[in-house]
Regions:
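A residue-level signal for conserved active-site and pocket-lining positions in enzyme catalytic cores
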Residues: 7, 99, 128
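Helix-centered, glycine/charged polyanion-binding patches within enzymatic domains
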Residues: 38, 43-118
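Charged phosphate-binding loop/patch that engages nucleotide di/tri-phosphates or the phosphate backbone
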Residues: 125-138
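Catalytic-loop motifs flanking and including active-site residues across diverse enzymes
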Residues: 22-25, 97, 124-127
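Loop/helix-junction capping segments adjacent to catalytic residues or to phosphate/diphosphate-binding pockets
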Residues: 20-23, 57-58, 122
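Electropositive, glycine- and tryptophan-enriched low-complexity nucleic-acid-binding patches
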Residues: 1-41
Length: 138
């Protein structure tokens, strides 16, 4: 999920099988999400991205740089090396808005169960929840 700084969802990825980690097809997934945001006439130049250590890959950091996305990604200590990347711990604390949005989504029991086997139904349930979240914020 990509949210704005208030936690309002802007884009959602397609469902990914549970046996994959966060970084599986990450660049392709985020690129598709960014294109969806741009189709809505929302500018993504200079987009600021907070992400946890699960998204700390060289390929994803390069993607962010190429697409003028300012990344603030916690370093994954399991990668075995400390890169020369800037990381702002104060700004990283703002990442809670995405976690809060995830908690809001968990309030929708149809999504929480996650046994939906039809991809279109899963996506539709998420988009419906996003609409409710947006309406609550207005």
């Amino acid at each position: 999920i990509i949210t704005d700084n208030k936690g309002i969802p802007l884009s959602c990825s397609d469902p990914i099988a549970g046996n994959h980690n966060d970084a599986h097809d990450l660049v392709k997934t985020v690129d598709k999400m960014i294109l969806n945001i741009q189709k809505s006439d929302i500018l993504t130049d200079g987009l600021f991205l907070n992400a946890d250590a699960g998204f700390d890959t060289t390929e994803f950091r390069s993607y962010c740089f190429r697409n003028d996305i300012i990344d603030n990604i916690d370093q994954n200590k399991r990668n075995g090396h400390q890169g020369d990347y800037s990381f702002d711990t104060l700004l990283y604390k703002c990442r809670f808005v995405v976690e809060r949005t995830n908690a809001w989504l968990d309030a929708f029991k149809a999504i929480l169960v996650r046994f939906e086997t039809n991809e279109i139904h899963w996506k539709a349930l998420n988009l419906l929840a996003f609409c409710v979240i947006l309406l609550r914020q207005l």
